[in-house]
Regions:
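Accessory beta-strand-rich segments of carbohydrate-active enzymes
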Residues: 2-20, 28, 39-40, 54-58, ...
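Short Gly/aromatic-enriched secondary-structure transition segments
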Residues: 64-77, 81-83
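A broad, low-specificity signal marking well-ordered, structured residues that form hydrophobic/aromatic
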Residues: 47, 76, 81, 126, ...
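Short, contiguous pre-domain boundary segments
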Residues: 25-37
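Hydrophobic small-molecule pocket/channel-lining residues, especially in calycin-type beta-barrels
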Residues: 62, 80-81, 90, 96
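Short beta-strand segments of immunoglobulin-like
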Residues: 231-235
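Surface-exposed, low-complexity/disordered Ser/Thr/Gly/Pro/Asn-rich loops and linkers
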Residues: 90, 94-95, 99-118
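N-terminal helix-cap/turn-to-beta initiation motif at the start of protein domains
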Residues: 41-50
Length: 235
């Protein structure tokens, strides 16, 4: 898929678009010495995406910006927000707690469940933008974006092009950005997160309902020929 349809967030048949296959959680270091130290943040194959991003929050999903991912978009009036960070803990609305039942049922006037439909009203959307410079020596390698946990979904663009989409709030989402990034040059990363999507019907847990980016995000580089996944089969 070369462009987002913006129907993905309410389509139960679409859980991901262009998301890399799930795999065993490990990090590939550039040398035996680096692997022995086992601090990926020091690795030449690692680049953090944590830190300050330009950020815009809207109360209702139909008020979200739809062209913010374009190169040259003016975001000077936007807020600054670090990632990882949950919206409700940074002044964007308040946390809701629900022991049983979906959190949109706590909102007056929208109390019915109608899967896969979720509300437009009070369905907050956060939009993020940031320019980065990818190491020039990553040219010729595969470059993967890792988003540790994003609630409830993520639409991703790089340099004005749609990359992909993912749901599953508590699972990491990875995307191969090799064909989108320009190592050694400025690159625009933009993504958008909805408070609720159709996948929220599968996430009725007993806890405070927070939204945004909950875990570390980063880029990492891999050689073209590599071990992609590990499996252990017992006797």
């Amino acid at each position: 898929m070369d462009a987002q349809t913006f129907k993905e967030w309410q389509d139960p048949e679409i859980n991901a678009v262009n998301r890399a296959p799930m795999h065993t959680n490990f990090f590939a270091y550039e040398s035996t010495e680096a692997a022995t130290e086992a601090v990926k943040e020091k690795s030449a194959n690692f680049m953090t995406l944590n830190g300050i991003w330009k950020f815009r929050w809207v109360k209702d999903s139909d008020a979200r910006p739809t062209d913010f991912w374009k190169i040259g978009y003016n975001d000077k009036g936007w807020d600054d927000l670090p990632i990882p960070a949950m919206w409700e803990l940074n002044g964007y609305d308040v946390p809701l707690y629900s022991g049983v039942g979906f959190d949109w049922k706590l909102w007056k006037g929208w109390c019915k469940n109608n899967p896969p439909v979720v509300p437009v009203e009070n369905n907050h959307v956060g939009s993020y933008r940031r320019e980065i410079i990818v190491p020039s020596d990553w040219k010729g390698k595969d470059i993967i974006a890792h988003f540790g946990s994003v609630s409830s979904n993520i639409y991703l663009w790089v340099n004005g092009k749609f990359v992909g989409y993912s749901e599953d709030s508590k699972l990491e989402a990875e995307f191969n950005l090799t064909s989108y990034l320009k190592p050694g040059q400025k690159n625009l990363i933009a993504f958008q997160v909805f408070r609720w999507c159709d996948g929220s019907y599968l996430e009725d847990q007993d806890f405070f309902r927070y939204h945004g980016v909950a875990r570390d995000c980063y880029l990492y580089s891999r050689n073209k020929k590599r071990i992609e996944d590990l499996r252990v089969t017992p006797d």
